[in-house]
Amino acid sequence: MSIEKVYDYFHNYDSKVYQIFACMGNEPSEKDILNFEKQYDISLPDDFKEFTMSPLGGLYMEVREELWPRAKVYDVAPFWTFCRGIMVYGIAKGIPDYLDIRVKTKELHDEGLEDYIPFFSIIGDGNTIFCFDKNNRIVALDWYFKVAFEEDEMNFSDFLLKKIKELEERKMQMIETLENRKN
């Protein structure tokens, strides 16, 4: 199962490159997940539920500041240079609002976008949020235009691994960009 590949990645990730926060120790129970599903009359994908109930649920993963400095107010740069991390929303007790799937779902539904359950976003991209639609397909939802675009057909685990790979590619590009500025 591809969720094992996700766990393998995080067992071996480079902690000198990424800082990672997750619910570790505050994992939600199966009952917490069922209550959320019942509230929104949905059934979340099994691999997402497993991930959410693991110590990695409510994941915040960001390239360390020393390697990829945060943008300053009024910085002008290519869009990708602002996208220095990822977040997977969770249901853990005491989870910050910006990582809480319940808070994010309420925000989305209050905007009239009730056919979607948000579960993922890229740090630095305030317009796009990734959601499960009513059929558990993964869609990229543009907050501004309120339009959903279907992602490639894949499960949550493969999607997460793809987004981590894209983050690693951006990190390498940023390191190269910063090196070129020094020379």
In which residue ranges do the predicted regions lie?
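Short, surface-exposed, charged loop/turn segments at secondary-structure junctions
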Residues: 65-66, 132-137
